[in-house]
Amino acid sequence: MQTDLSDSSFFNHKSVMTDEILASLEHYPLIHNNQLKGIDATLGGGGHSYHLLRKYSDLHIIGLDQDPFARKSASKKLDEFKNRIDIRAANFADFEPKEKVSFVIADLGVNSNQIDDPKRGFSFQKDGPLDMRMNPFLEVDAEKLIETLQEKDLANLIYKYGDERLSRKIARKIKMDLKVNGKYSGTKELAYSIAGCFPPKQRYKKIHPATRTFQALRIAVNKEIEVLEKFLQIVPDWLLPGGIISIISFHSLEDRLVKSSFKNDQRLKNLTKKPITPSEQEVEINKRARSGKLRVAQLN
C-alpha cells in the first residue's frame, strides 16, 4: 500500500546542520553576487533550500528528489520562493544540469518522514510492508530482494552494508523462514526474526539488533553506494570555477567515499580534512543529527 500523495502533512522533516551548510558556502568567492545559482541534490522536505533562499535573495535553486512525496511537500514549503526554485523528479546520479552552478549541496541521510511513515517500510518501530524504496517506482523492494538473493549473497550484503558480524546467521534464518513460512507479514516480523539470532542479553540493548540489517537492506534496495560513487564522479563538472560541494553523510561507508573523493579528485580542493559535526545543541534538539558528518570541497 502506498502513501496518498495528496497528504504531505506527515512530511515534516527537520533538516540537519543547516547553519554549517550555510557557512560552507561562504567559501565561494562570489556567494553574495547577483544571479547566484545552486543545486540541492537531495531536496527532501525543502529545509536546506528554504534557509538558502531566505538568506540569498537573488539565489535560484534546482532541487532534485526521486521521492514524489518529498517533492510535493517541498513544493508547499517553498511556495513563497516558487519563482526561484525549480523542483525536478530526479536521482542526483542521473541528473545533468544545462549550465554550471555556484554550489551543490547533498544530505545523504534517509528523511525522517520516510522512516516514520510505516507504509514506506523503512522502520520496524511500526509495522509496515517490506518496501524501503526511496523511489516508489523502483522494481525491487526489500521483500523481493530477500526472496531472490541466494543465502551467501544476502549474508555478504548484510555484512558489507550493515557491518553486521552475525550476517551469516541472519541470512540463514531469513532464507529458512521464507522457505518454511513464506513471505514475512511486514517489518516487525522480520525484525523479530533477526533479533532471535542474537544472544538474549543483546536483544534488549538501546540499539535494536535488527538495525544494521535494515540499514543494509535499505542501502541495497536503493543502490545508495553505487549512486553516490557515480554522483561523486560527475558533480565537479556541474560547478563554476571556485564552486562549492557540501555533502552530509550519516554512516561510515558514505563518509569514506566522500572523504576519498574530496582528497583524491584532482579537480577539487578539500576544505575539510576532518568532517564538521553537529553542535551539541542541535543533537539535543534533534537526536537523528548526531551521526551527521559534513565535508566540503571547492572546484579548483
Swiss-Prot record:
Gene Ontology molecular-function annotations: rRNA (cytosine-N4-)-methyltransferase activity
Family, similarity comment: Belongs to the methyltransferase superfamily. RsmH family.
EC number: 2.1.1.199
GO cellular component, one term: cytoplasm
One GO BP: rRNA base methylation
Superkingdom field: Bacteria
Catalytic activity: cytidine(1402) in 16S rRNA + S-adenosyl-L-methionine = N(4)-methylcytidine(1402) in 16S rRNA + S-adenosyl-L-homocysteine + H(+)
Alphabetical list of InterPro entries matching this protein: RsmH (IPR002903), SAM-dep_MeTrfase_MraW_recog (IPR023397), SAM-dependent_MTases_sf (IPR029063)
Binding locations of S-adenosyl-L-methionine: 46-48, 65, 92, 107, 114
Organism from which the protein derives: Prochlorococcus marinus (strain MIT 9312)
UniProt keyword Transferase, yes or no: yes
Key words of the record: Cytoplasm, Methyltransferase, rRNA processing, S-adenosyl-L-methionine, Transferase
Stored CDD domains: AdoMet_MTases (cd02440)
Known role: Specifically methylates the N4 position of cytidine in position 1402 (C1402) of 16S rRNA.
Intracellular or extracellular location(s): Cytoplasm
rRNA processing among keywords: yes
Name of this chain's protein: Ribosomal RNA small subunit methyltransferase H
